[in-house]
UniProtKB/Swiss-Prot annotation:
Source organism of the structure: Anaeromyxobacter sp. (strain K)
PANTHER family hit by this protein: GLUTAMYL-TRNA(GLN) AMIDOTRANSFERASE SUBUNIT A (PTHR11895:SF151), TRANSAMIDASE (PTHR11895)
HAMAP family, per database record: GatA
Biological role: Allows the formation of correctly charged Gln-tRNA(Gln) through the transamidation of misacylated Glu-tRNA(Gln) in organisms which lack glutaminyl-tRNA synthetase. The reaction takes place in the presence of glutamine and ATP through an activated gamma-phospho-Glu-tRNA(Gln).
Quaternary state and interactors: Heterotrimer of A, B and C subunits.
Protein's UniProt name: Glutamyl-tRNA(Gln) amidotransferase subunit A
Enzyme's top EC category: ligase
One GO BP: translation
Length: 492
């Protein structure tokens, strides 16, 4: 008797892969369940910008043939996943959530897409996002907003909103997102899933539509810590096509997963719990810290004194890099072109005016101003100096602890439309996550409960030393094992 499609969709990534390996279920069954789930729910969620049903079915048939021959490529072989629409996919539209890339069909795959497919994972589609990954609510998508599965009137977070919503709603078993200032961890916290921003350079950025090149990093989202660890192990590693890619060997993140929290030193930054947090979020975070103490970890008071300057530094550095990266969208080489323009100069201006949304335009203006003659030293250079101070703060804190723990966001998921009229309020959603990117450190969001008042998920942020993702997974798994899984969100 076959397993109902809804039950297949709620299987963990490794659980689904094990079922295919044991021939208890087929990849084709998993993919059909995923496609049916997307068809049934995405009209309300808006998590997908494109679904590649025919390609997914063909990949599933190939995975089933490999399983029949006993030639499975990995634990991911035959399992449905999806990727943020910021990764180029050969022959499949890639928009980065922007009208200026509407209709663009890349001639190649991003490295992370290649690695997923080489492992046998079945990519069923491309996920909704804020335009060029600029946003914290997914409301900056040029195509449609994405909704939180826990409450359709609320944001799933951004910019990887579709990546988090699709996993939380059971449309796919895992997804990929990007994180420039919190864009994996914030949606993961809002949607009650696990989200990982690896160390800068741990995962190749080749084939990722660039926002801020010194901050962007690729990472997984999944419903279980171990599943996220498996996906990261699959996509991590050196890539000669990315000059920022590290040659450091990739750890086996699954090996220490069940080692528990005993003996860990958990740093708690006093600046992160000294105000500005909603009461329900603070209560859940403090309860998670108490859980670590009960499990045998030692809580250590640490200080990150320059973290208060993180937002200011980030919103000088990131827009400066974005203004350079987005200069390539000129209507000449690819993407939208103002064909009715009279002359080259007008074509440049009109193509960008019609193709770019309000938030990219705002950040291009900010970045161009920060880099302009007479202001470079006063703004951009000073922001880079603050970045160095933030990195030194973390270095000093890690002298006395193994991981740093605190909130991911100041609040639970907020209402759609609540902050769109106030960009500064929107930017403050990333106040606890941005410093991790500025310091190039690995960070992770793991569910730590539901806020009592709203019943919405709260995430705990864990930050580690460079390239020590293994300790983050160990610490996150200890909490996950003790607290148990969150309930599934309501049916859309």
């Amino acid at each position: 008797m076959s397993t109902p499609a809804k039950e297949l969709c709620r299987l963990g990534l490794r659980e689904a892969g094990a079922g295919v390996a044991a021939k208890a279920i087929s990849s084709s069954e998993l993919v059909e369940a995923s496609l049916a789930r997307i068809q049934a729910t995405d009209g309300k969620l808006g998590a997908f910008l494109a679904v590649s049903a025919d390609r997914a079915r063909a990949a599933a048939r190939a995975a089933d043939a490999r399983a029949a021959r006993g030639e499975r490529r990995s634990e991911l072989d035959g399992v449905p996943v999806a990727v943020k629409d910021i990764f180029v996919t050969k022959g499949v539209p890639t928009t980065a959530g922007s009208r200026i890339l509407e209709g663009y069909l890349p001639p190649y795959d991003a490295t992370v897409v290649e690695r997923l497919e080489a492992a046998g994972a079945v990519i069923v589609g491309k996920l909704n996002m804020d335009e060029f990954a600029m946003g914290s609510s997914n409301e900056n998508s040029a195509y449609k907003p994405c909704h939180n599965p826990w409450d359709l009137s609320r944001t799933p977070g951004g910019s990887s909103g579709g990546s988090a919503a699709s996993v939380a709603a059971g449309q796919v078993h895992a997804s990929l997102g990007t994180d420039t200032g919190g864009s994996i961890r914030e949606p993961a916290a809002f949607c009650g899933v696990v989200g990982v921003k690896p160390t800068y350079g741990r995962v190749s950025r080749y084939g990722v539509v660039a926002f801020a090149s010194s901050l962007d990093q690729v990472g997984p989202l999944a419903r279980e810590v171990g599943d996220a660890a498996l996906v990261l192990r699959t996509i991590a590693g050196h890539d000669p096509r990315d000059m920022t890619s590290s040659t450091r060997p990739v750890d086996d993140y699954l090996a220490p997963l069940e080692d528990g929290a005993r003996g860990l030193r958990v740093g708690v930054p006093r600046e992160w719990l000294s105000g500005g947090l909603d009461a329900g979020v603070e209560a859940a975070v403090r309860a998670a810290l108490d859980t670590y103490r009960r499990l045998g970890a030692t809580l250590v008071d640490v200080s990150l004194p320059h973290s208060k300057y993180g937002i200011g530094a980030y919103y000088l550095i990131a827009p400066a890099e974005a203004s350079s990266n987005l200069a390539r969208y000129d209507g000449v080489r690819f993407g939208l072109r103002a064909a009715d323009a009279k002359g080259l100069k007008e074509m440049y201006a009109e193509s960008r005016e019609r193709g770019l949304g309000a938030e990219p335009k705002r950040r291009i203006m900010l970045g161009t101003y920060a880099l302009s003659s007479g202001y470079y030293d006063a703004y951009y250079l000073r922001a880079q100096k603050v970045r160095t101070l933030i990195r030194r703060d973390f270095d000093e804190a890690f002298r006395g602890c193994d991981v740093i723990a605190g909130p991911v966001t100041p609040s639970v998921a907020f209402k759609l439309g609540e902050r769109t009229g106030d960009p500064l309020q929107m930017y403050l959603a990333d106040i606890f996550t941005i410093t991790c990117n500025l310091a190039a450190l690995p960070g992770l969001s793991v569910p730590c409960g539901l806020e009592a008042a709203s019943g919405l998920p709260v995430g705990l942020q864990l930050v580690g030393r460079p390239f020590d993702e293994a300790t983050l997974f160990r610490a996150a798994r200890a909490l996950e094992r003790e607290l148990g899984p969150l309930p599934a969100p309501p049916e859309p």
